[in-house]
Amino acid sequence: MSVLVYSFASFVLGWCLRSGITYFTRLMETSS
């Protein structure tokens, strides 16, 4: 049970981090 929650949390965290990085790079490209 805890392993499933841990893997799901890491997946969501990784997805948020990746989308945040792509959004940040896109914002920097448009600003410059």
Curated annotation (Swiss-Prot):
Report the GO terms under cellular component: host cell membrane; membrane; virion component
Write out the transmembrane intervals.
2-24
Entry membrane topology: Single-pass membrane protein
Keyword check for Transcription regulation, yes or no: no
Can you say where in the cell this protein is located?
Virion; Host membrane
Keywords in alphabetical order, please. Host membrane, Membrane, Transmembrane, Transmembrane helix, Virion
Give the chief site where it resides.
Answer: virion
User: Per its database record, what is this protein's job?
Assistant: May initiate with G7P the virion concomitant assembly-budding process, by interacting with the packaging signal of the viral genome. The assembly-budding takes place at the host inner membrane. In turn, G7P and G9P are present at the end of the filamentous virion that emerges first from the bacterial host.
Protein family according to the UniProt entry? Belongs to the inovirus G9P protein family.
Annotated protein name in UniProt: Tail virion protein G9P
- State the organism of origin: Enterobacteria phage M13 (Bacteriophage M13)
- Which gene codes for it? IX
